[in-house]
UniProtKB/Swiss-Prot annotation:
Possesses antifungal activity against F.graminearum. This is Antifungal protein 1 small subunit. The keyword DNA-binding does not apply. It comes from Malva parviflora. Antimicrobial activity is not affected by salt concentration. Keywords: Antibiotic, Antimicrobial, Fungicide. The keyword Cell inner membrane does not apply. GO terms for biological process: defense response to bacterium; defense response to fungus; killing of cells of another organism; xenobiotic metabolic process. Heterodimer of a large and a small subunit.
């Protein structure tokens, strides 16, 4: 992937 924005922020915490 090109970044953490491809997967929804479900416990990932990368969407902050």
């Amino acid at each position: 992937p090109a970044g953490p924005f491809r997967i929804p922020p479900r416990x990932r915490x990368e969407f902050q």
